[in-house]
Amino acid sequence: NYMQEPSSSAAATFTDDSIQKCLNPLRSVNHEPPKDCSVYIGVDPALGSNNCVIAATPHEGKLKILFIREDLGLTRNEQILGIVEEAVLQCGRNGSSVSDVIIEAMVFQKGLSRDERLIEMTQRYGFRVREHLTGMNKYDETIGVPSMALSFMRGDIEIPYADDPSTRHQADQLIRQLKAWRPLKRGTKLRQDQVMALWFIWILYRQRKQSFALDTSQFNYKGLPWGSTMPARQVF
């Protein structure tokens, strides 16, 4: 159990209290998505190390994580794309479907997000691919990972935490990374692939939530790390 592990909470971006607010003991990663929902998938791709996929849906005023998948030691882009397709199919139950797949597009991943097989998948399943361009923006207090902490404090993000082995394993891995995350600590020294994949989804969730609450002509999209050239007004 993650709560039994020591941590230096003084400098934590994501505190035990805020994480605790987001745990749902009645939801399992084995449950179907809520009925007729749009699902977002965040992908932090990696060959040789930790490849992470997270699926979440905006539902009942929260961003609800459906499941987290991590694979080690992948050697080919085809394997990553196969995992993405499996995630899309897993989310396509109970009348729900994937609307957006957000993929880190720095360095080698740029080729992945523009792979013909992925483009063919978008045509088959009807989702849009977004390239996420991570740089120093992940430390930004208004759009970076630290800004996601407020959603945890408010309980706006839901982590499944039913008492079954799959759910606890997936949730506890994410929670460990959240508790350990610190600004300006390099990913080579700190595991953060799951935090990154969740952040990709959360940015889109926040962007859409705010655009519904505000007149979009007044909303400032500056700083959003999308590689897409699609105007914001056409996203929704």
Labelled PLM ranges:
Residues 1-5, 11-19, 104, 159-166, ...:
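Short coil/turn segments at secondary-structure boundaries
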Residues 1-43:
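ATPase catalytic-site recognition across NTP-hydrolyzing enzymes
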Residues 1-2, 6, 176-218:
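P-loop NTPase motor core of the ASCE superfamily
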Residues 9, 60-181, 232-236:
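Mg2+-dependent endonuclease catalytic cores in nucleic-acid-processing enzymes, primarily RNase H-like
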Residues 11, 15, 199-236:
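Acidic two-metal-ion nuclease catalytic site recognized across multiple nuclease folds
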Residues 33-59:
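Gly/Thr-rich phosphate-binding beta-strand-loop-beta motif of the actin/hexokinase/Hsp70
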Residues 36, 47-49, 77, 141, ...:
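Active-site-proximal structural scaffolding
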Residues 48-50, 96, 208:
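A cross-taxa feature marking solvent-exposed loop/turn segments within ectodomains of secreted
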